[in-house]
Amino acid sequence: MILKNKLTKETLDIPYSEFRIKFAKEIQDAFESYRKTQLNKYSWNFKDDNSLEFNFYFELQWNFNHFGNSNWYIEKI
């Protein structure tokens, strides 16, 4: 994975497993924001709650970059 810092333009090239460890708090914050957004949608009442986490990780790059409040963003997976 290639991550880039929005402020310093520093680039990290790390494996997914290291990303999960190093950015655990940012991932959790992004997931909670994603979860709240999805559950507030009227149409979500007709869907399965168990698919929330799957859907979040399926589009991890977009969700982390848009729902997370981090100085880092995923440039490429």
Feature map (PLM): residue ranges:
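Acidic, low-complexity, intrinsically disordered interaction modules
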Residues: 14-77
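A short beta-strand micro-motif
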Residues: 1-6
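Glycine-centered tight beta-turn/hairpin loop motif at sheet-sheet or coil-to-beta transitions
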Residues: 7-9, 51
